[in-house]
Structures are given as structure tokens and as C-alpha cells.
């Protein structure tokens, strides 16, 4: 699995530049954006959502049911009654 470092090395830019391009932030020339996007495509880089959530101090619930199906629910995405269902699912799998 490709890392941010791999993309930066291939594009010939810093990791922070790669991050700015991926997050669509300002201050990056169009030619540099194209190099980074090409490197992302070549490497098959996929941003790590869990790492991003940790940096943003966001949280989620990750549950695997008895069949092996994984449920990933981001904080704020559920109503109170749905949270109760997720908690019940967790209890059933303990």
C-alpha cells in the first residue's frame, strides 16, 4: 500500500505539498497539482480515513458482526435510536 511519502517522492515534492493537493487547499501551482495527481494515480495511493479522523479528533464506531461484515459509522452520522441498535449489535458480538 502506497504512503504519502511514496507519492511525494514520485512527484518530487514534499509530503505537505501532497497533503495540500489531496485536501484541495490553496497555494499549490496547477503544474504541481498535476504532478501530485499523476503520482497518486501511479502509486494507487488511498488516504487513510482513520488517520485523518484521528488528526481531526473525530471519532467513529467500528463493528464487525458474526458474519464478518464490518460496519463503520462516523460520529454524528446516527440518530439516538440508531446508536442504540449499534450498541445492541456490539453486545451480541461480545
Swiss-Prot record:
UniProt keyword annotations, A-Z: DNA-binding, Repressor, Transcription, Transcription regulation
Pfam families attached to this UniProt entry: LacI, YtfJ_HI0045
Positions of the HTH lacI-type domain: 1-56
Superkingdom of source: Bacteria
Record-level Gene Ontology MF annotations: DNA-binding transcription factor activity; transcription cis-regulatory region binding
Protein's UniProt keywords contain tRNA-binding: no
Residue spans binding DNA: 4-23
Gene3D superfamilies linked: lambda repressor-like DNA-binding domains
InterPro entries membership: HTH_LacI, Lambda_DNA-bd_dom_sf, YtfJ_HI0045
CDD domains in the cross-refs: HTH_LacI
Role this protein plays: Repressor for the scr operon. Binds D-fructose as an inducer.
Protein name: Sucrose operon repressor
Gene it is expressed from: scrR
Amino acid at each position: 500500500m502506497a504512503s504519502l511519502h511514496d507519492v511525494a517522492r514520485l512527484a518530487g515534492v514534499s509530503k505537505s505539498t501532497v497533503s495540500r493537493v489531496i485536501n484541495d487547499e490553496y497555494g499549490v501551482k496547477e503544474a504541481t497539482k498535476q504532478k501530485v495527481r499523476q503520482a497518486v494515480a501511479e502509486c494507487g495511493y488511498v488516504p487513510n480515513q482513520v488517520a485523518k479522523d484521528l488528526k481531526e479528533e473525530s471519532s467513529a464506531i467500528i463493528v464487525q458482526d458474526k458474519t464478518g461484515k464490518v460496519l463503520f459509522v462516523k460520529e454524528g452520522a446516527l440518530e439516538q435510536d440508531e446508536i442504540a441498535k449499534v450498541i445492541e449489535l456490539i453486545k451480541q458480538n461480545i
